[in-house]
């Protein structure tokens, strides 16, 4: 399986997601992206472990390590993502940071943002882009395993009303329990 490494650190650096040719065995090469065979070389951006590497796949639905391209066995291009509570916490932090920015001014927003690591800030900015791309690609996401990297408090979040070709955010992400979110915000 070949993946595409997103070398940019902001949304414009992830333009590869918007330019991927999703036909099997074909891929467009665009600025900011390069093909890399797994395992990834040491020192790739965001690589604290293989699961945390920031990647985009040919279908644009694998931004976190742990996803698996299943095209060889099913004939379809979809991924089995392995999201962690940490990513969901980052998304929650972004929402709180934006709210506090409006309510408390720039200083309040900056204080909230400072509690995120650079990796978490990056994840919080791309979580909505991943949802958008998976929806556009019509990617059908298989069930997410109950156990995730942090070992507890996570559950698959599925939206029964959503169809495989129109995925809602709830059907894509593994959400944290209320206790973990409260802990993350404390």
Curated annotation (Swiss-Prot):
Compartment(s) of residence:
Nucleus; Chromosome
- What does its PTM field state? Phosphorylated in an ATR-dependent manner; phosphorylation is required for interaction with H2AX and RAD18 and for DDUP-mediated DNA damage repair.
Highest rank taxon of the organism: Eukaryota
Per the record's keyword annotation, is Lipid metabolism included, yes or no? no
GO BP term (any one): recombinational repair
Q: Name one GO cellular component term.
A: chromosome
Induction per UniProt is: By DNA damage.
Cite the residue spans of the region called Disordered. 147-166
Kindly indicate whether the keyword ATP-binding belongs to this entry.
no
Which UniProt keywords are present, listed alphabetically?
Answer: Chromosome, DNA damage, DNA repair, Nucleus, Phosphoprotein
- What does the UniProt function comment say about this protein? Promotes DNA damage repair through both homologous recombination repair (HRR) and post-replication repair (PRR) mechanisms. Enhances the retention of DNA damage response protein RAD18 at sites of DNA damage. This allows for HRR via association of RAD18 with RAD51C and for PRR via RAD18-mediated promotion of PCNA monoubiquitination.
What more does the record tell us?
Answer: Treatment of cells with ATR inhibitor Berzosertib abolishes the interaction of DDUP with H2AX, RAD18 and RAD51C and inhibits formation of DDUP foci, leading to hypersensitivity of cancer cells to DNA-damaging chemotherapeutics.
What interactions and quaternary structure are annotated?
A: Interacts with DNA damage response proteins ATR, H2AX, PCNA, RAD18 and RAD51C. Forms a complex with H2AX and RAD18 following DDUP phosphorylation.
This protein is called DNA damage up-regulated protein
Q: Which organism is it from?
A: Homo sapiens (Human)
The taxonomy runs: Eukaryota, Metazoa, Chordata, Craniata, Vertebrata
In the UniProt record, the gene name given for this protein reads CTBP1-DT
């Amino acid at each position: 399986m070949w993946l595409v490494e997103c070398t940019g650190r902001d949304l414009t650096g992830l333009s590869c997601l918007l330019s991927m040719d999703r036909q099997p065995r074909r891929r467009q090469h665009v600025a900011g992206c390069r093909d890399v065979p797994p395992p990834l070389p040491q020192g790739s951006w965001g690589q604290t472990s293989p699961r945390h590497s920031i990647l985009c796949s040919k279908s644009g639905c694998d931004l976190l390590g742990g996803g698996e391209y299943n095209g060889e066995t099913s004939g379809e291009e979809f991924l089995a993502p392995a999201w962690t509570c940490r990513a969901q916490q980052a998304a929650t932090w972004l929402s709180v940071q934006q709210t506090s920015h409006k309510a408390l001014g720039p200083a309040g927003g900056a204080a909230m943002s400072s509690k995120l690591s650079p990796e978490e800030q990056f994840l919080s900015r791309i979580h909505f882009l991943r949802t958008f791309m998976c929806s556009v690609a019509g990617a059908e996401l298989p069930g997410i395993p109950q156990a995730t990297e942090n070992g507890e408090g996570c559950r698959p979040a599925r939206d029964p009303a959503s169809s495989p070709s129109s995925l809602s955010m709830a059907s894509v992400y593994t959400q944290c329990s209320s206790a973990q979110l409260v802990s993350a915000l404390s």
